[in-house]
Structures are given as C-alpha cells and as structure tokens.
C-alpha cells in the first residue's frame, strides 16, 4: 500500500464510536478516525457538536486502498451499520449531530453512493424510504483523542452501548442472515 494509492471515505451513521470497528477490521484499511464534519464551526469540540449549534455530525473518515477494499464495499459495510430510513438520528442518538450521511470526495464516489442508495431503496429490504443524505465532503475535524479507537480502549463500554442503543438488535434483525 503506497500513500499515492490511498483514498479517503467519510461516513456519518450516528455515534462514531459504533462506526469505527466494522471498517477498522477490513483489509486495505489504513486508518479510521472519529470526528466531525458537515457544519459551520471551525475545529468544534464534542460538547459543541452535541449542543446542536455547529451544524456538524459525528462521522468517521477512512483512509483506504481501493485496490484492496474498493469504495463500493465500504458503502456496503456502511449501510449495514445504520438505519438508512431514519434521517433524524440513529437509534437512541437523536438530532442533527447524529444524522446519517455519506460524504463523497469525488464524482466517482458520489455516483457509487447514489446507485447503491437507489438499489437499496428498490430492494424492498425496508418498508420506509431510504433517506440517508449523500453530500460533498467538507473539512473533517478529528475528534478528541479519547474518542479515537473507542471500541479498543473501552471494550465493555462500547459493547454495552451497541446493545443499549438498539443498534445491535437493529443490525441483527435487518442485516444478518
């Protein structure tokens, strides 16, 4: 994997703690960073983003090798971590800072995301329409260090939150098997 061959992908799917592990464990992923994007405040803090005044959403930014794990597969993994029918947040996390968004970095990513969204909508997997936003990537601000790799640093807290938030049950009911 050379630096020149690496690309970025940015996804918002509710609490960023829950979004890192599914990508971090895939081949061809160099790093996954938790952070904030899509708003108007420069270098926001977690507290500011949670206040709902920054316009930012919690997101992850992935550095990946598309020759090993193409963007199409990243989008597929993304859908399987979210409730794509809920634009007002994800699971127990409500509000703009938890809205689901696929942020594209180029026209190819935009086209892949739009086609994937249309295919998921047409599949009939969900009774409600797919409302996940697809938007141009903006400045990404890494979150505070204690949020990075949360699933590794705070394993019990992370696993408990996956269950308590309703995310684990939703994924099992809608994406497994």
Curated annotation (Swiss-Prot):
GO terms for molecular function: L-methionine:thioredoxin-disulfide S-oxidoreductase activity; peptide-methionine (S)-S-oxide reductase activity. InterPro entries: Met_Sox_Rdtase_MsrA_dom, Met_Sox_Rdtase_MsrA_sf. It comes from the Bacteria. Gene3D superfamilies: Peptide methionine sulphoxide reductase MsrA. One of its GO terms (biological process) is protein modification process. Its EC number is 1.8.4.11. The active site is at residue 15. It catalyses: L-methionyl-[protein] + [thioredoxin]-disulfide + H2O = L-methionyl-(S)-S-oxide-[protein] + [thioredoxin]-dithiol; [thioredoxin]-disulfide + L-methionine + H2O = L-methionine (S)-S-oxide + [thioredoxin]-dithiol. It is an enzyme of class 1 (oxidoreductase). Coiled coil: none annotated. Has an important function as a repair enzyme for proteins that have been inactivated by oxidation. Catalyzes the reversible oxidation-reduction of methionine sulfoxide in proteins to methionine. Belongs to the MsrA Met sulfoxide reductase family. This is Peptide methionine sulfoxide reductase MsrA. It comes from Listeria monocytogenes serovar 1/2a (strain ATCC BAA-679 / EGD-e). The gene is msrA.
